[in-house]
């Protein structure tokens, strides 16, 4: 298994969104689509179980994961990914910005942590940073 290399450019054109709020999914799908001139493929999963099932059969360039999911914490999925697919980058997009949760997500293997409360311009800039190999962490969660 190859670990994720932070110096590698991340592909956002094939993204798995692990999010149980359909409005947030649509928002992120639109942001990702606006960033590319070519079509993008975004697949959504509304639970940990659904995400694991998709990840066992499909390839992605990036996983965007929420922390609060109906069947557990997105941090569990990040840890699972580190064992199953360590080269696949995972970024948290959550409304939970508590320092302890941010640290747990990063320790589990997330390469970035973004807050949903940011406007589309800020989230778009953070996603572009990820695409170029950056590892953005929202300042509100990095206190």
Which role does the model predict for each range below?
Residues 22-43:
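Two-component/phosphorelay signaling modules centered on CheY-like receiver
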Residues 102-106, 117-143:
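Short, flexible helix-to-coil linker/hinge segments that flank and couple to helix-turn-helix
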Residues 66-67, 94:
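Active-site residues of response regulator receiver
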Residues 47, 73-76:
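Acidic catalytic/metal-coordinating carboxylates
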Residues 19:
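Conserved acidic carboxylate
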């Amino acid at each position: 298994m190859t670990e994720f290399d932070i110096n590698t450019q991340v592909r956002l054109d094939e993204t798995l969104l692990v999010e149980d709020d359909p409005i947030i999914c649509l928002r992120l799908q639109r942001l990702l689509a606006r960033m590319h001139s070519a079509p993008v493929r975004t697949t959504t999963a509304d639970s940990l179980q659904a995400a694991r099932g998709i990840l066992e059969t499909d390839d992605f360039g990036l996983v965007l994961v929420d922390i609060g999911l109906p069947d557990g914490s997105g941090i569990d999925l990040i840890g699972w990914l580190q064992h199953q697919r360590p080269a696949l980058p995972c970024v948290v997009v959550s409304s939970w910005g508590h320092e302890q949760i941010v640290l747990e997500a990063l320790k589990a293997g997330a390469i970035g942590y973004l807050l949903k409360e940011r406007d589309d311009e800020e989230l778009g800039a953070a996603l572009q940073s990820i695409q170029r190999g950056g590892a953005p962490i929202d300042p509100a969660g990095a206190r």
